Amino acid sequence: MQYSPNLAHGTLLRRYKRFLADVLLDDGTEITLHCPNTGSMKNCLFPGETVWFSTSNNPKRKYAHTWEQSSTPDKQLIGINTGRANALAEEAINLGVIKELTGYDRLQREVKYGEENSRIDILLSSDTRASCYIEVKSCTLLEEGSTSGRGYFPDSVTVRGQKHLRELIHMVKQGHRAVLLFVVQHSGINSVSPARHIDVAYSELFTQALDAGVEVLAYQTQMSPQESQILTSCPVIT
């Protein structure tokens, strides 16, 4: 995924009201960014560090700038925009990067499914095999003080994420293939685990999903102000 134009940068001052962040530009101008991340952003907020943002030409938007990436004190790069995870996953599937998800004829986004009024992030289908329902999650929480690069999901209690696991379990029971795909958007994360210390219910449903036959994959993203792309798989530690 290429950014056109390249992402601009500034210095993070503060995040507030959940969806807003103030940034100081090199020329001394202070601007407000839209923060497209509903999580706690635990271990992702570092005032005084560099952030990168995109700019929209849509005149109807209240905030033209969107927070895309952030730097940590040890110069790791984090993808803040959780909405990018779905687009990155779609691109990687179409390019054949995610080997476990090749061999399908059609890819659809945001298709209604399940029993709880849900929409699947990605649906793969073919005339010769069972459909594959894929829920995409962005993983950015690096374990504090970790030397092994262990990442966790979620970074806050997620009732919505719990619902998605129940839906995936249901699809397996209906004879379909179901996949939970973690898109790792933190350059310091080398493995992914369910965050039992944050959301016990999610962790328990995660185990139930594995037992039911839901597949869990994790892939790392290479990021820069010019482009982001999924490159390699990493372990899921349960």
UniProtKB/Swiss-Prot annotation:
It comes from the Bacteria. GO terms for molecular function: DNA binding. Pfam families: SfsA, SfsA_N. InterPro entries: SfsA, SfsA_C, SfsA_N. Belongs to the SfsA family. This is Sugar fermentation stimulation protein homolog. It comes from Shewanella denitrificans (strain OS217 / ATCC BAA-1090 / DSM 15013).
